């Protein structure tokens, strides 16, 4: 007897023996269902359920369901490539955000024409509606099969799987691939897909290993979703922060300093405006600011645990007075040193310590991407040292601050990923229970929706990741809050409790922006360079029509500068139409145009970015409107 409980309905069905999803679900429901979750594990609809189970239905409209369809598409692509180019060897084909890829070993260089042919073949395979058939094989069966058909990379993967563990393969028509699954019932479920590009990749990510060709694709639940995504990509290309930054003269990156930013005048103004804004928020919320060294002894990184876990990503200075030093990849161990510089009492807690900390990480050159992925960066980093019973209230305060900052920067759609305890972790379950409960209650009280990432917390504590949605619907994970029970203990941090004894504080690692570099990249793309007036590097440009207006324009400029307005004055002899085009292309939000008439009447002609309309205002009225648009409140 097998008892099946449907988690959403709490409805129980009993069966005389083993059953599958096809047995359990009604035929009409099967059209939208791609898989099941059985006691928390994903199952194909054809996989047998052998014991009592709680069932959750996975539909195509679910995030997990769409991920399964993309996994299907990766297998279909691999089959298409093998049919078109039989000498190609297949390696791995996972899903990624918005799509999938598959790595192929071949002497052939895939072209755009090849992608067209592969896509056509994929459509034929979809039309054939081959069933995805799961089979459990022994290790020997798997090695014999894949070595027999010359798939050496699959044999290599099998060799890394523990001895005695059975393996699963999936068959679709004549094509067989090593795979954990799950898959949808058949290839016909993949309704809307497109191959996007070809890139190089190394086997197992090792630059010393064989070079492979990676084909990227995307797949969606229907053609409307696919077309919407492709339109979003076109819009994203127009908003590429690297292109806009070049047009606006914000920054550049060059080979002599790979992954590090050369901020130009306008870009650094933007950077400083953002930093000043965050600094004010921190001060108003009870933080104090510190500055810690960039070069720190290996000994501290060993004690903190970063040397073992993070050494490959650290820049090492071999010798300095017989000491090995490392450029810091993060600020937290240094902040503990400041905490440890005094004896702390429970009355001092919480301590909110902030730093605009410059860090460096040795990211691979292939992963670098404009401001979005760099080697040298500055974090809006802060650490809150508190007692365990203060975790909830501090998390609520942080969530409120984060929501306020995101909203004022133009992001009102925020979601949260909550990562709870991993299998391997420090601390006892009671401590984890309290920490997880404190975070979840704080998120709910802040009015934020969250998604559970089971087992994805760090070994030293649970984690919140804050995801914002931009103007074209893309999600960006920026803010974080991480509970840490371990680092204060490792580095000897303590406070004197009400009982007169020493206690280790809980440490909350938190950031709102993440890094200034990446967040500025996100801001550029969100606004397409057309920043709100308060944030714009140049808030106003005064353009003269004639030299007779130069003195008036300069006088206005000086008044505005005294008021803190970031203003430029264009007194060149160029035609006014050229000046308007120039400063509009530089995304200056407001233009004041002055000529003989404006000088006489003490007025300005106001033109806003993106509009061809000009309106005449008295200088007093225009100034009042300008200051109002600059003021956040």
Curated annotation (Swiss-Prot):
Its main location: cytoplasm. Disulfide bonds: none annotated. The keyword Transmembrane does not apply. Its EC number is 6.1.1.3. GO terms for biological process: threonyl-tRNA aminoacylation. The keyword ATP-binding applies. Binds 1 zinc ion per subunit. It comes from the Bacteria. It is an enzyme of class 6 (ligase). It is found in: Cytoplasm. Zn(2+) binds at residues 332, 383, 509. GO terms for molecular function: ATP binding; metal ion binding; threonine-tRNA ligase activity; tRNA binding. Residues 240-532 are annotated as: Catalytic. Belongs to the class-II aminoacyl-tRNA synthetase family. Homodimer. Catalyzes the attachment of threonine to tRNA(Thr) in a two-step reaction: L-threonine is first activated by ATP to form Thr-AMP and then transferred to the acceptor end of tRNA(Thr). Also edits incorrectly charged L-seryl-tRNA(Thr). This is Threonine--tRNA ligase.
């Amino acid at each position: 007897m097998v008892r099946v409980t449907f988690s959403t309905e709490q409805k129980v069905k009993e069966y005389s023996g083993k059953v599958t999803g096809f047995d359990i679900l009604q035929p009409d429901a099967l059209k939208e269902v791609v898989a099941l979750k059985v006691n928390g594990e994903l199952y194909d609809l054809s996989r047998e359920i052998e014991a009592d189970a709680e069932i959750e239905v996975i539909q195509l409209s679910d995030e997990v369901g769409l991920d399964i369809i993309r996994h299907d598409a990766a297998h279909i692509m691999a089959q298409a490539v093998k049919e078109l180019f039989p000498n190609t060897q297949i390696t791995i084909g996972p899903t990624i955000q918005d799509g999938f890829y598959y790595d192929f070993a071949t002497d052939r260089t895939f072209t755009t024409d090849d992608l067209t042919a592969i896509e056509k073949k994929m459509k034929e395979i979809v039309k054939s509606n081959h069933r995805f058939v799961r089979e459990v094989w022994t290790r020997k069966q798997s090695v014999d099969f894949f070595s027999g058909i010359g798939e050496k990379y699959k044999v290599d993967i099998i060799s890394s799987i523990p001895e005695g563990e059975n393996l699963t393969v999936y068959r679709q028509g004549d094509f067989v691939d090593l795979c954990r699954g799950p898959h949808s019932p058949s290839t016909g479920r993949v309704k809307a897909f497109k191959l996007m590009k070809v890139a190089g990749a190394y086997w197992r990510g090792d630059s010393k290993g064989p070079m492979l060709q990676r084909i990227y694709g995307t797949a969606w639940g229907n053609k409307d979703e696919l077309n919407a995504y492709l339109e979003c990509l076109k819009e994203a290309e127009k908003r590429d922060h690297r292109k806009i930054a070049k047009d606006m003269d914000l920054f550049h990156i060059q080979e002599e300093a790979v992954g590090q930013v050369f901020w130009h005048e306008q870009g650094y103004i933007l950077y400083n405006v953002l930093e000043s804004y965050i600094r004010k928020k921190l001060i108003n919320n009870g933080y104090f600011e510190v500055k810690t060294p960039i070069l720190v002894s290996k000994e501290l990184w060993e004690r903190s645990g970063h040397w073992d876990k993070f050494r490959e990503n650290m820049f090492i200075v071999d010798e300095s007075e017989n000491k090995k030093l490392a450029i810091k990849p993060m600020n937290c161990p240094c902040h503990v040193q400041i905490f440890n510089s005094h004896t702390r009492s429970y009355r001092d807690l919480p301590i909110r310590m902030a730093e605009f900390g410059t860090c460096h990480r040795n990211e691979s050159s292939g992963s670098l991407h404009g401001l979005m992925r760099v080697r040298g960066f500055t974090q809006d980093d802060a650490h809150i040292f508190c007692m365990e019973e203060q975790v909830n209230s501090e998390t609520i305060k942080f969530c409120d601050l984060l929501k306020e900052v995101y909203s004022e920067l133009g992001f009102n759609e925020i979601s949260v990923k909550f990562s709870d305890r991993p299998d391997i972790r420090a601390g006892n379950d009671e401590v984890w229970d309290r920490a997880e409960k404190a975070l979840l209650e704080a998120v709910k009280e802040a009015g934020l929706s969250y998604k559970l990432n089971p087992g994805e917390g760090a070994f030293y504590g649970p984690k919140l990741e804050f995801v914002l949605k931009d103007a074209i619907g893309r999600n960006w994970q920026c803010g974080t809050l991480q509970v840490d029970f371990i680092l204060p203990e490792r580095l000897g941090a303590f406070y004197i409790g009400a009982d007169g004894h020493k206690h280790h504080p809980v440490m909350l690692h938190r950031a709102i922006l993440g890094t200034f570099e990446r967040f500025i990249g996100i801001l550029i793309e969100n606004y397409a360079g057309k920043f709100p007036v308060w944030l714009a590097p140049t808030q106003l440009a005064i353009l003269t029509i004639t030299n007779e207006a130069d003195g008036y324009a300069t006088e206005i400029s000086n008044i505005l500068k005294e008021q803190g307005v970031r203003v430029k004055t264009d007194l060149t002899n160029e035609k006014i139409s050229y000046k308007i085009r120039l400063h509009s292309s530089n995304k200056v939000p407001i233009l004041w145009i002055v000529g003989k008439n404006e000088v006489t009447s003490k007025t300005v002609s106001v033109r806003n970015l993106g509009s061809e309309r000009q309106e005449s205002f008295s200088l007093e009225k225009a100034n009042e409107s300008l200051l109002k648009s600059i003021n956040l409140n």
